[in-house]
């Protein structure tokens, strides 16, 4: 505490020297408890230089700030309204003492004046718990730099300070500024409102201009940090020359403005965000007008969003669309008339009880300036004005509670700053239908509004077009905006146009907003929630066309009954089944005839039965595969077909043995006959086939699988075997071997008696089977599409028909149409003729 006290001591002498009588009742109202007010009524725009820093600047020499006077009038109006309210602070007269701080030039002296006692003494103490200052609370000032300067002094005394427009996030630090509160939303809410506005209109390529002071740097940094998390890029950021209150603009600063506007002209960005006090912008916008930079969207920070003097530059209407972030408009009944009331025309001012006052308490041109801008101020609504108004009421309610005024009377006791501060933190009341309270950071959650500048005299110059709600952090109720564009179209400010659905971004340069759009390849899609820069592959059961944002289910392909190929194959299978059934009946009725006996006798019925079963298996190839149908395809049908071929091979071998090998190898033939050689051979072949089938099923399983059609990726082929090609080679190997054996023995018996010569029939059947199987294997080695199943089924049915009609058909023909050749005598004569020819 001692260093701060020493500082106060060193400035005490300055305080005594600068005291002078008050001249204007606008700045002072006596009362039981005084409020201090710090407002910017003047600001340096003329470049006046002060060489003597020991003298406080004379603010009246600067340009009048109409907004500042408007805010000061709001404090006067609130105090007078409270004094006339019998329910709030009854029997207590609230007074005020207000000072013009000239923006940042005159902050320290008024603070010392407020902290001093009535005798202008500010004692050096170690404990200020029981210290009573001239004012009980301070309202203001308006900018963050000035607020921090004032707060550093007031915090030592825990004297309540409520600022109405400073938004810097640094002010939320209650360790540094324990006595500071504010009735304006913090900077992060202003930034969030801007960002949501830009996102709403899809502006992702912006320019940021900041002033060189703390306000510009801090808010520019906040915006940059916020945009680092989103999809908005800053094309470039420039610092505007800041005209200090004690200097003219230099030639370098003027050249700097020219350079900045040149960059604006050359940039493709058409949204310009400006964080700067209004003082810095007059020269800047004059340069913008000089270079005729048009077509931009200007987004104003709260420091100049509703500045009537800047708005008075009517040529700005041709420069583009002006949008600003400001506090919501809350009309205050009676204030519009009060603002322009001449204090000399009203009741005579009360005489001061103290002969001492501070400097910069005069503003000869304020009322005239307010009158000239009164229409703009009236139409724009009471925005920041309400922040001052609510700040005064917050102090009044806290004082009401501290003085125990709830029962109609107040106890007028000394008020220590820390006591009042404690009560201000607790206030919670409704003022003009708005809840007034402070959060733990000392902020009041007032809504923000997006306003558009209008220059139509019949309209509000600052027309509200949207609202931002800090508690929800959401921008709502966006209304139509009058864009200064052809056909009133929304301006476009994008480094790159948005990619269409199904296009990935390819970065160009260092900005994430600058990119090329590349179509996603077929079979891939773009999931923007995961990665906008890489297309993701579709799941195995899905597919996509080029430039798709999602995948669709692949069509499952399998044989269906309504398809023409299936119908053709089904008709062939039905023909084969009926033909085989007819052959079976014919053979049954002529079982004892030599023709049936020579064809194999009982073995023929085994073959015909297996052929019927094989024909019955054909329907399981149609429809979606199941475990049961896959079993029939992979086990039942191959087994039946192999046994049929083995019967033909064994039968051809047996005929050759009878006529050619029995005489040469009688003992071997006797063993063949004695031990049922044909059936043993067939049993062996059957067991061997069963082993191969079981091995195949164990290797591949019976569960249906899917594979992508190589000709059409949109189709997923459903099959019983993922390695169908290899399985086909494995399963047909034995059958091909048997067909070759049968063909060989049939060829060896081509000279046998006509009734026993089956060479041409077996050759026809086996050659057809061999050729079709080899053709199918060749086809599958080159093609793996949806036609594989139908080709496999077609070859299967044709092979069955080759056996049914090619092997058994001629025998039935002989039985039915040449019965005279189906007699034992005829067969014996044919055998005798063969024997005689051999001899």
UniProtKB/Swiss-Prot annotation:
Disulfide bonds: none annotated. Residues 1-19 form the signal peptide. The chain crosses the membrane at residues 567-587, 603-623, 636-656, 682-702, 728-748, 761-781, 785-805. It comes from the Eukaryota. InterPro entries: ANF_lig-bd_rcpt (IPR001828), GPCR_3 (IPR000337), GPCR_3_9-Cys_dom (IPR011500), GPCR_3_9-Cys_sf (IPR038550), GPCR_3_C (IPR017978), GPCR_3_Ca_sens_rcpt-rel (IPR000068), GPCR_3_CS (IPR017979), Peripla_BP_I (IPR028082). The keyword Glycoprotein applies. Glycans are attached at residues 84, 127, 248, 292, 312, 368, 428, 487, 527. One of its GO terms (molecular function) is G protein-coupled receptor activity. SUPFAM superfamilies: Periplasmic binding protein-like I. It is found in: Cell membrane. Residues 588-602, 657-681, 749-760, 806-839 are cytoplasmic. It is a multi-pass membrane protein. Forms heterodimers with TAS1R3. Putative taste receptor. TAS1R2/TAS1R3 recognizes diverse natural and synthetic sweeteners. Belongs to the G-protein coupled receptor 3 family. TAS1R subfamily. This is Taste receptor type 1 member 2. The lineage of its organism: Eukaryota, Metazoa, Chordata, Craniata, Vertebrata.
